[in-house]
Amino acid sequence: MIKNPYRYSPWLTVVLRISLVLLLFSVSRVFFYIQNRDIFGPLSATEWFWVLVGGLRFDVVAVLYINLLYILFTLLPPGRHAGATRVFDVLFVVTNAIGLLLNCIDSAYYAFNLKRIAWGSLGELKGFNNATELLSSFLVRYWYVWAAWLLFIGALVLIVRYVRSTRQKYNAHTYVDVFLLTFILCMFGFRGNLRYSTRPLGLNDAGKYVRSPQNVALVFSTPFSIFRTIGEARLEKYSYFSDEKELEALYNPVQQSEGEGPFRKMNVVVLVLESFSEEASSVSNTNTTTNRFMPFVDSLRKKSFYTEYSFANGKKSIEALPSIWGSIPSYTQPYVLSEYSSNKIYSLPLILRDKGYHTSFFHGAPNGSMGFQSFANLMGIDHYYGKDEFGDNSQFDGIWGIWDQPFLAYYSKTLKTFPQPFFSTIFTVSSHDPFKVPKEVENKYPSGPHPIFKAFSYTDDGLRKFFESIKHEPWFQNTIFVISADHTSPKCDLPEFRNSVGVFRIPVFFYVPGMDLAGKSDRVFQQTDIMPTVLQIMQYDQPYVSFGKNLLSPKTKDFAVNKYENYQYIYGDFLLKLDAGNKGVGLYRYKTDKLLEKNLLETEPDTAQLLERNFKAYIQQFQNRMIDDRFTVK
């Protein structure tokens, strides 16, 4: 029992407690920044001031949502009784502890996702069959997150013990007045402003408080992100262009391979490499501290059709396969989890299956993990091989799946049994947090600035052995090998790989040993380009819908699209950053201005206008077709 708690009127007690919770949210914002300072970079005192001021505005909304029941019940007459007060104290601690827990978890998770957790992100948890192992690993590796959360809980307990209300009696009129006033203030608080002529405070409003668009996640909290994105999974149609001919002239997703000739029944093997970042490659990174960890992939890349500037379309594993197989870019939420996931997509596996191909997908994770098995079936994959089919739990890494080297050996052995022609994809797992390699080979591979670099080398060596084992197969020369990472690593050492361009730079290349295709291109590659480029190599002669480009055609625009909080549009040498309303807010020559320090928006307005116009045509085609289920050619 506290002998001298501070006692106030019930209304003032609520105000003081909420104010102290707002202070804790600001502290959690600082903690969030500290854990991700390599991503956000240094902030000046002025920048911090506006982040905290803007953050307070967003936190008021989130904290009012979190404490709505506590506020209303406390101010009702039953809330004056001692028993009810204890119940509401517990409610106050528990609900605010959950809100602060979300902020703490996101301080670690943000590096993987590059955006705050949203309502749609929570659905991704259903796809993990190994949730227990993942949670155990998270508890151990990110112990400081839980330590910070326990400190926040301690602060909440101190608040309810020291800031208490008197048991005052009021007449019915006073109760009604206080309750109505509180309710009205809460309604305005939920909106984030006092004007009904404006929209409620949204995620895009955070841009007012930062200089760099990539720092908006510092302003709003994770609870705010979740509350504001509930029910917002639906896309909205755009009408930037009312003239269909004008729209199609700027961007037409209905594509067809160029040239004439019979369809080439070549085998297709797609290798999706977990978290392989351009930073670990010597092809475009000259820093020897980080560029020496995928020697085989680099050597194979130089024998392939490749570029120094290739990009992921998203930042999650679950976003990679729709981009690679279906030429679908990343958008508000992962396509696999969206309401549009049942849309008709004439994907690369489906096209080839209709041509008589054997189709397969290999993923060493527990069967069904991340919803890949179901999605693969929708995309035309007839044969799925996961941890269950591998059948040897002694090779399980304890968290994500079968170690890459034995699973790649299993892939090679199984691939040799398939009838030709075949389409097959493998998705590696070992270079995933916590970036472990088998103990027996720990000393075989070099260490880097972060454990993921050793994991890169381990998987890279597994890929070398895989290609050694199949290079004498009779079908090898008649096979198109596509190598792409799913996304970049959450841990980057060099500043140029931590900005909004670098965090999407991955290897994407085409190795075709039986054709004279090898060479370095000066074009921009992205994952959505894989499908149209493979179909061009095979001389597929039917129209299809793709939101990438045929890299072998000089007629296609040289662009890439990805989402970093908001969309960004890469076009040749330029990067255009867009706000939530798809208006350009930053223009950079990203190839020479590697840290994106010189905004050319005002000095090159014509270029900015051109890129914005191209992007708006692209996004209008994409979203309107997604809503109308028009991803196939009738």
Predicted stretch roles:
Residues R195-V545, S553-E565:
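Soluble catalytic regions of membrane-associated enzymes that act on cell-envelope
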Residues I2-F220:
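Transmembrane and membrane-interface helices of multi-pass
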Residues R37, N67, S282-V283, L494, ...:
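Short, function-defining helix-loop hinge/capping sites that tune catalysis or transport
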Residues N36, R141-W146, Y411, V441, ...:
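Residue-level recognition of alpha-helix termini/interfacial anchor residues
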Residues G54, L100-N103, F224-T229, A617-Q620:
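Short, hydrophobic/amphipathic alpha-helical patches that form generic packing surfaces
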